[in-house]
């Protein structure tokens, strides 16, 4: 696991965009996340597409999750969200952006089919991730199995409450079930790119990076991955104990060693 500490989340977004640009230029498969954390990175990639000609035409992409029962046309579906925030602004073909089907007649079966589709398409080359304040990744809440596959999960009441801000503050409008890639599925991506910003993420970052690998902190599974990059701003890194080494390692990184 490589830890990159940046002064601000804008600096982090630029580094993340540098990493993703390499994959885009090679036509690789991207794993996309929604939420506020990757927005700066998406905006920087959109800028490079518009101003520098960065193309995503040869790429394909998979999203992490979707609400169960929410039509994809709904503005808060993750199908709509990823297009509104990123993919509709670049040249990746829409038919090459794959999403879980939250309105499938048989959601459990659809989850298994999505898991198989990822494998059939060659797997994910780089997966963007964010971390919840409780250490969750995607919708894998604490105590999720580290071997879990794409499946249906019941949202924690706190998650429903948090997400109600996207539904005019009305918790009754927030779906209580989601289809999410499992931790085992996510682990199969060849490169995990974790972005963490803000002091409210400091405890989760500490648990993920320097705590034990445990189901109570799903993100701690990154410690077992052969190629994980964690980019944090100063606020999110505030509780890490080994920042001196993380900074030293980055400053002395050989030119030939990519992120």
Swiss-Prot record:
InterPro entries listed in its UniProt record: Glc/Gal-6P_isomerase (IPR006148), Glucosamine6P_isomerase (IPR004547), Glucosamine6P_isomerase_CS (IPR018321), NagB/RpiA_transferase-like (IPR037171)
Active-site residue numbers: 65, 134, 136, 141
GO molecular-function terms, A-Z: glucosamine-6-phosphate deaminase activity; identical protein binding
Root EC class: hydrolase
GO cellular component, one term: cytoplasm
CDD domains per the UniProt record, alphabetical: GlcN6P_deaminase (cd01399)
Keyword Hydrolase assigned: yes
EC number: 3.5.99.6
Keyword set, alphabetical order: Carbohydrate metabolism, Hydrolase
Function: Catalyzes the reversible isomerization-deamination of glucosamine 6-phosphate (GlcN6P) to form fructose 6-phosphate (Fru6P) and ammonium ion.
Family statement: Belongs to the glucosamine/galactosamine-6-phosphate isomerase family. NagB subfamily.
Protein name according to UniProt: Glucosamine-6-phosphate deaminase
Species assigned in the record: Corynebacterium diphtheriae (strain ATCC 700971 / NCTC 13129 / Biotype gravis)
């Amino acid at each position: 696991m490589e830890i990159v500490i940046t002064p601000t989340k804008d600096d982090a977004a630029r580094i993340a965009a540098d990493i993703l640009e390499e994959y885009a230029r090679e036509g690789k498969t991207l794993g996309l996340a929604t939420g506020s954390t990757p927005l700066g990175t998406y905006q920087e990639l959109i800028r490079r597409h518009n101003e520098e000609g960065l193309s995503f035409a040869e790429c394909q992409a998979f999203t992490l999750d979707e609400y169960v029962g929410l039509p994809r046309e709904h503005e808060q579906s993750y199908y709509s969200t990823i297009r509104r925030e990123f993919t509709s602004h670049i040249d990746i073909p829409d038919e090459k952006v794959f999403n879980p089907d939250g309105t499938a007649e048989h959601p459990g079966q659809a989850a298994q089919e999505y898991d198989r589709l990822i494998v059939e398409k060659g797997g994910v080359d780089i997966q963007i991730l964010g971390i919840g304040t409780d250490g969750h990744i995607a919708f894998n809440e604490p105590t999720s199995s580290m071997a879990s596959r794409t499946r249906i999960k019941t949202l924690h009441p706190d998650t429903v409450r948090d997400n109600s801000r996207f539904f005019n503050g009305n918790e009754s409008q927030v779906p209580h079930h989601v289809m999410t890639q499992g931790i085992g599925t996510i682990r199969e991506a060849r490169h995990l790119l974790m972005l963490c910003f803000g002091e409210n993420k400091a405890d989760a970052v500490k648990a993920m990076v320097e705590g034990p690998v445990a189901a109570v902190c799903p993100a701690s599974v990154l410690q077992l991955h052969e190629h994980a990059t964690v980019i944090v701003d100063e606020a999110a890194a505030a509780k890490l104990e080994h920042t001196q080494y993380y900074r030293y390692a980055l400053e002395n990184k050989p030119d030939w060693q990519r992120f």
